[in-house]
Amino acid sequence: MAKEATRIRRRERKNIASGIAHVNSSFNNTTITITDAQGNTIAWSSAGTMGFKGSRKSTPYAAQVAAEDVSKKAQEHGMRTLEVEVAGPGSGRESALRALQAAGFTVTSIRDVTTIPHNGCRPRKRRRV
């Protein structure tokens, strides 16, 4: 019984001109996901997947490197224009946005979609250093 050769599944090239970049910047990491208008993921990257570990993940430079990586992947699918949705309190928000603009995307709109509680859950304790 010979084992069947496993097929290598290639990503099909979608030809999408415009999309939405979701930049989620927490205190620990920055993730950037590029979707089409329906919300289907086309490309994603994060500071952690780019090889940054620990406290280096939360730096603006790590967010910039992740944004450059995800923009390269999205441009392979023919993407040219982006709407940017920024969420979270982290330090990688602006640098990720600048890196997306520098990669050659036309940014049509920038929205801050950070969730703000109307006095919901109790927040974590204050940090004393």
Swiss-Prot record:
Record keywords: Ribonucleoprotein, Ribosomal protein, RNA-binding, rRNA-binding
One GO MF term attached to the UniProt entry: structural constituent of ribosome
Domain of life: Bacteria
A GO CC term assigned to this protein in UniProt: ribosome
Keyword flag rRNA-binding: yes
InterPro entries in UniProt: Ribosomal_uS11 (IPR001971), Ribosomal_uS11_bac-type (IPR019981), Ribosomal_uS11_sf (IPR036967)
Pfam families: Ribosomal_S11 (PF00411)
Record flagged with keyword Magnesium: no
One BP annotation, GO: translation
Quaternary structure annotation from Swiss-Prot or TrEMBL: Part of the 30S ribosomal subunit. Interacts with proteins S7 and S18. Binds to IF-3.
Family membership noted in the UniProt record: Belongs to the universal ribosomal protein uS11 family.
Function text: Located on the platform of the 30S subunit, it bridges several disparate RNA helices of the 16S rRNA. Forms part of the Shine-Dalgarno cleft in the 70S ribosome.
NCBIfam families xrefs: PRK05309.1, uS11_bact
HAMAP family given in the database record: Ribosomal_uS11
Name of the protein this chain belongs to: Small ribosomal subunit protein uS11
Species: Rhodopseudomonas palustris (strain BisA53)
